[in-house]
């Protein structure tokens, strides 16, 4: 299957004929990038999770796999105001003037085919059998924001 989610290891793995893309859900429900590159057959790729030994003195979390600093971790969907000082993928401001956003993994869906993105450029497939889609649902419990991250794997690239 082009997209798998290992619930036990909490790893998403997306395969095309030539490439693999993988990310991991931490014990604190943050999404961390694991790998993108040449296709790999392994299903257990948590050994690729990079946990630095020497964390800088910045806010960090400890989720049982060692502490990780948001400023050093390869966050899959970086947001602003949560100790990651790199460029965020989005910025918002709520009605109270707060701009912090922290997205936590909530659930996912894997299905054949691809939803249309109205008004946006997108890849396409001739039939639903040529593409598998992954939707990762994230929530920010502080401001009620719900985010859907969409991924797809095309069989013929």
Task: Walk through the language-model features, giving the residues of each.
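Conserved, mostly hydrophobic/aromatic
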Residues: 18
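Short, surface-exposed, low-complexity cationic segments
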Residues: 26-44
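An extended acidic
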Residues: 49-144
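Conserved small/polar residues in nucleotide/adenosyl-binding loops
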Residues: 155-157
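Hydrophobic/aromatic beta-strand elements that line small-molecule binding cavities or substrate pockets
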Residues: 149-151
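Short, Gly/Pro- and small/polar-rich lid/capping loops
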Residues: 1-10
């Amino acid at each position: 299957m082009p997209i798998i989610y290992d619930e036990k290891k909490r790893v998403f793995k997306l395969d095309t004929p030539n490439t693999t893309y993988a990310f991991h859900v931490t014990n604190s429900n943050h999404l961390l990038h694991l790998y993108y590159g040449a296709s790999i057959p392994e299903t257990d790729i948590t050994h690729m999770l990079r946990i630095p030994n020497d964390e800088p003195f910045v806010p960090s979390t400890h989720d049982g796999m060692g502490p990780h600093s948001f400023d050093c971790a390869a966050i899959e969907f970086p947001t602003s105001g949560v100790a990651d000082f790199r460029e965020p993928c989005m910025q918002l401001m709520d009605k109270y003037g707060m701009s912090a956003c922290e997205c936590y993994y909530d659930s996912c869906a894997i299905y054949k085919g691809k939803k249309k993105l109205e008004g946006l450029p997108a890849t396409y497939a001739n039939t639903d059998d040529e593409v598998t889609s992954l939707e990762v649902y994230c929530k920010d419990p502080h401001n009620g924001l719900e985010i859907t991250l969409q991924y797809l794997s095309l069989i013929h690239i």
